[in-house]
Amino acid sequence: MASTISQTHDKPGRQKLFEWNYDADQEMLCITTEMMTERKYTLDEIRFVLQTLQEQFGAEWFPLANNPALLHDGKERPGLGMVLWKLRRDVKHAQGAVYLGVVLEELGFLEWNRRDAPVGWRVIAAGMDKTMLRLSLTNL
């Protein structure tokens, strides 16, 4: 299974490299950070994230929204991290938004606002079903 190396969006010098690939057997996007921390997102989770962001924001920009203290208290503003937190109520999982956003951008589902602060995206490929996600991830 081929891996892709990508970089988070942040202020110059603070960006982080990470590796990602799609595990077809488990139908899971696997992300490994510079610190060798793994984040895994199922196709159903990714579909839910894209659908929820489309419903909440339409074609408008949404924030990263992955502040650990605010996520833990459930007080983070609506955005990518908060959608992930609602899925599992797991701050570590939700903080992976910084990586997942870049992957979804590289796959053509999101557009980045070209800012290092505040980082944001918008949905540009709405209505993705599980089959379309699988095809996008397997045709890297």
Residue ranges and their predicted role:
Residues N66-A69, D116:
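Long Lys/Arg-rich low-complexity intrinsically disordered regions in nucleic-acid-associated proteins
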Residues A69-Q95:
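Short helix-coil junctions and helix-kink-helix linkers
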Residues V98-V102:
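Short, hydrophobic-biased segments on the C-terminal half of alpha helices
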Residues E105-P118:
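A short, conserved structural fragment
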Residues A126-L140:
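Short, amphipathic alpha-helical interaction segments positioned at domain boundaries
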